């Protein structure tokens, strides 16, 4: 039986914040900050596909000026905005975010990674849709997430701590997952390697533990912990002549911290141009500027690709 697939190229990847990252949802009068980070329907930080695609497209046009025609074909032309592009990106789902930790029962870490069951379910949904719409199967990550989702407690992976205080105010009792495969898989995804080779389950990294523990929280407390991890910065605009604040020159911005991890994917229909773009341009891109703020040392991210 021949199975027809809609997408020929599916390239999932993690976005790791190298610096604090601000991808703005625009000016708000209802939020605690003037320029909040983009949020999904459950109020978790997210990076919408339009912002991600625009940033990657702008970066690639500068870095690969000799391949502008191919980039326009795959990501869309500025001169013909009504013409459908061959490729697209998914909204980037928050996968894990650093949270400050105070060890209560043996956990000796200044910070740990935190995620929630709801965020993992969203990543699972993306993986299942990619598996359905393409010939490529990303079963290793999907199986690892499914193993976690079978639980219903606050979990810690890669540490035996029984409890922890997160972001100064949240005392959490923990259950440990003793699963070397999940530990090594997530360890590679989160910290250690740029890519994870799904076909090599017996790789040298198989016995490694996470460089930082991963705590999976119930949704009832997880969103509050994550919200407390966000960084809110007040900024001012100074009159150079008088060294005073300009009228209306005081505002606040919201950032996700260094080492935050988002999950997304590039999807494209098959063509010679798409093949060249995916393998010779996009997959070779490791660092880019996302959300602006590069003039104040913000917005640098690293792309960590999953191997097919």
From Swiss-Prot:
Pfam families: RAMPs (PF03787)
The UniProt record lists the keyword Cytoplasm: yes
Subunit structure: Part of the CMR ribonucleoprotein complex, consisting of crRNA plus Cmr1/Cmr2/Cmr3/Cmr4/Cmr5/Cmr6 at 1:1 and possibly 3 Cmr7 dimers. A Cmr2/Cmr3/Cmr7 subcomplex without crRNA can also be isolated. It does not cleave target RNA.
Keywords assigned: Antiviral defense, Cytoplasm
Entry protein name: CRISPR system CMR subunit Cmr4
Stated role: CRISPR (clustered regularly interspaced short palindromic repeat) is an adaptive immune system that provides protection against mobile genetic elements (viruses, transposable elements and conjugative plasmids). CRISPR clusters contain spacers, sequences complementary to antecedent mobile elements, and target invading nucleic acids. CRISPR clusters are transcribed and processed into CRISPR RNA (crRNA). The CMR complex degrades RNA complementary to the crRNA (target RNA) within UA dinucleotides, generating 3'-OH and 5'-phosphate ends.
InterPro entries the UniProt entry points to: CRISPR-assoc_RAMP_Cmr4, RAMP_III_fam
Subcellular location: Cytoplasm
Gene Ontology BP annotations: defense response to virus
Keyword Hydrolase set for record: no
Assigned protein family: Belongs to the CRISPR system Cmr4 family.
GO CC term (a single one): cytoplasm
Principal location listed in the UniProt entry: cytoplasm
Coiled-coil annotated spans: none
């Amino acid at each position: 039986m021949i199975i027809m697939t809609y997408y020929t190229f599916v390239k999932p990847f993690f976005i790791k914040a190298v610096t604090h990252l601000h991808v703005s949802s625009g000016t708000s009068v209802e939020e605690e900050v003037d320029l909040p980070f983009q949020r999904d329907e459950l109020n978790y930080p997210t990076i919408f596909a339009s912002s991600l695609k625009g940033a990657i497209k702008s970066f690639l046009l500068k870095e690969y000026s000799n391949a502008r025609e191919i980039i326009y074909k795959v990501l869309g032309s500025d001169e013909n905005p009504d013409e459908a592009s061959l490729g697209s990106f998914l909204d980037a789902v928050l996968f894990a975010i650093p949270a400050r930790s105070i060890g209560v029962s043996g956990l000796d870490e200044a910070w740990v990674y935190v995620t929630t069951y709801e965020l993992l379910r969203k990543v699972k949904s993306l993986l299942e849709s990619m598996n359905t719409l393409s010939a490529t199967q990303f079963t290793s990550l999907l199986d690892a997430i499914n193993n976690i989702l079978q639980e219903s407690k606050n979990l810690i992976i890669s540490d035996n701590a029984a409890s922890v205080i997160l972001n100064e105010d949240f005392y959490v009792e923990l259950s440990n997952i003793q699963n070397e495969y999940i530990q090594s898989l997530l360890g590679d995804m989160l910290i250690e390697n740029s890519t994870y080779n799904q076909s090599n389950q017996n790789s040298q990294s198989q016995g490694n533990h996470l460089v930082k523990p991963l705590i999976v929280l119930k949704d009832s407390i997880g969103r509050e912990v994550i919200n407390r991890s966000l960084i809110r910065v007040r900024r001012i605009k100074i009159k150079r002549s008088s060294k005073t604040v300009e009228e209306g020159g005081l505002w606040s911005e919201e950032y996700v911290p260094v080492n935050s991890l988002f999950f997304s994917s590039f999807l494209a229909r098959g063509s010679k141009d798409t093949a060249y773009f995916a393998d010779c341009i996009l997959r070779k891109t490791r660092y880019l500027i996302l959300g602006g703020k590069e003039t104040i040392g913000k917005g640098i991210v690293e792309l960590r690709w999953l191997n097919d």
